[in-house]
Regions:
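PRPP-associated nucleotide enzymes
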Residues: 2-132
Length: 132
C-alpha cells in the first residue's frame, strides 16, 4: 500500500502508526484516534503519509498527537489526492516554513459529506473493509 511503498524507498527510516478515523454526528465531523505508536521525533524529518487529504483535520489531529513523542525539525505531509479546502486548512494550521505539502493531485471540492470530488472513495474502507 501507500505506506509500504514509502518504507521501501526510505528503507532506513523509523516508522510510526496512527489509527485515525472520522466520527460523524449530523453535520459535525470529528477525528477519533484509537492508537498511536512511534519512536522519538525530536529533531528528525517527519513524514505524515495518508492517501487522502480531505478536510485536513485527520492530518492536524494526528500530528498534534505525535508531538507527544517529540518535536521534529521538519514536517512533510504527503497525500495522493487532496482537496483545495484541505490544503487551505493545513496552510492555516501550519506555518509554511515548518511544513512541506506533497500531493499528486488537488481536486476542486468536497461534497456535503466532506468527501473529495471526484476523489477515490473511502481509502480505508476500500483497503481494509468497512469499520466494525
Amino acid at each position: 500500500l501507500f505506506r509500504s511503498g514509502f518504507m521501501q524507498v526510505f528503507d532506513n527510516a523509523d516508522a510510526g502508526f496512527v489509527a485515525a478515523y472520522r466520527v460523524e454526528d449530523g453535520n459535525d465531523i470529528s477525528i477519533q484516534l484509537d492508537y498511536l505508536a512511534c519512536p522519538s521525533l525530536d529533531n528528525c524529518t517527519f513524514m505524515l503519509v495518508d492517501p487522502m487529504l480531505a478536510t485536513g483535520k485527520s492530518f492536524e489531529t494526528s500530528y498534534r498527537a505525535y508531538l507527544n513523542n517529540g518535536t521534529p525539525a521538519k514536517l512533510h505531509i504527503v497525500a495522493v489526492v487532496a482537496s483545495e479546502q484541505g490544503v487551505a486548512y493545513l496552510k492555516e494550521c501550519f506555518p509554511s516554513d515548518e511544513v512541506t505539502l506533497w500531493c499528486a493531485v488537488i481536486d476542486p471540492e468536497l461534497n456535503r459529506l466532506s468527501y473529495i470530488v471526484p476523489g477515490l472513495g473511502d481509502c480505508g474502507d476500500l483497503c481494509y473493509g468497512e469499520k466494525l
